[in-house]
Curated annotation (Swiss-Prot):
pH dependence (UniProt free text): Optimum pH is 5.5.
Record-given protein name: Beta-glucosidase 23
Residues linked to a glycan: N60, N461, N494
Gene3D superfamilies: Glycosidases
Gene: BGLU23
Amino acid sequence: MVLQKLPLIGLLLLLTIVASPANADGPVCPPSNKLSRASFPEGFLFGTATAAYQVEGAINETCRGPALWDIYCRRYPERCNNDNGDVAVDFFHRYKEDIQLMKNLNTDAFRMSIAWPRIFPHGRKEKGVSQAGVQFYHDLIDELIKNGITPFVTVFHWDTPQDLEDEYGGFLSERIVKDFREYADFVFQEYGGKVKHWITFNEPWVFSHAGYDVGKKAPGRCSSYVNAKCQDGRSGYEAYLVTHNLLISHAEAVEAYRKCEKCKGGKIGIAHSPAWFEAHDLADSQDGASIDRALDFILGWHLDTTTFGDYPQIMKDIVGHRLPKFTTEQKAKLKASTDFVGLNYYTSVFSNHLEKPDPSKPRWMQDSLITWESKNAQNYAIGSKPLTAALNVYSRGFRSLLKYIKDKYANPEIMIMENGYGEELGASDSVAVGTADHNRKYYLQRHLLSMQEAVCIDKVNVTGYFVWSLLDNFEWQDGYKNRFGLYYVDFKNNLTRYEKESGKYYKDFLSQGVRPSALKKDEL
């Protein structure tokens, strides 16, 4: 299905891209009559992203230990679309070929993650270090650098060592803090001399909410009144505890990073994943007020804490005793504990205030006193949603979210760690259909334009952008049915890669203008 047209889309390639006046505060954008790399400030990085569990495979090589998702998908195959990451897209064996695919796209950077159990098979250094696993990431990082691609490394992208999960419940226990700091410090010391961009945690909201409040992702915990599939868990409690331990772990890891001599000159942050919200009913003042509350619960929960040192006051007021408290020392470590804001943006929703919460059935969504709606009070959808789309497409929300972060958090540096379009092709899935991904191409066009407007008009300090994803891969509870890649992976025929129309578009977009690697370092 061809994507429904939205305002500006028909004019996109004819539009004269706004240039910044040279004396304006904020980013300076060159004049351009076509949206491309040349429409952005010099030095702006463009790349693609993946995560270890979603692409590597090779779960029995390099003495890798079991990860949370390995066991979860074996125990509950129906909750992983009867798929798993045992082989994934075999990036472990094909990374050199895949790096050539990155070069083909003219990208500058690649976001990857390190699998904790591939480094410490049993979760802790004292129980053994996999030197083969350590060497694999050295080889991967070196190959990226050799090919002119800057590595961005995520320390934790949801692959908790199963041994720690079995021993004390993983992030449900404060014992995770010491173990995570040890692991993070190890990878900083090992790779910090050549990796200068780090992300401690990917999407802490998704990890805690989906894993411990609604049970849609591993470890699949929640109360039965939220999801009957959950066999254990306590909604409205565990998600807050997990995030609390995660944030303290982040602060400890950042302290270790800032003491790392090899790491000098680098930056560290978190990749957040909020939606943007519009009022469900513009005539209802409560819906308007609910937007700030929604953003505090989905973004401020983590970003307020790592910026100001504590949770948003509205969360303290509503959640009450169920929200753990930080010590004075923890607050001091958390405050200003990031060098940039990592942002993953996919979609937006309407925010409808919740009239009658049920205190006997607490959960994160109810605590925020809103419901998420895909249509407003007038029955209009937010953006568009093609038949195969996983999420509604609303690029205006991208720009609004960027401006919100600039205004609330004193204009921090922002890096777009993920932005992409997922689609489920179903019975029509084939190489021919999957590579003709015009909807994804239009999604990228519109979101790149919205980001360019945020940078060049709103003066938001965005410095990098990564498409999710380089390749179709294992998409958690959706398995392999939900495709996000710029390259189609043929799961029926040797995992062969095929460039999609979106990949051709991104390559053309990046072919114009000066790559950061072509600039002198003192010009950046």
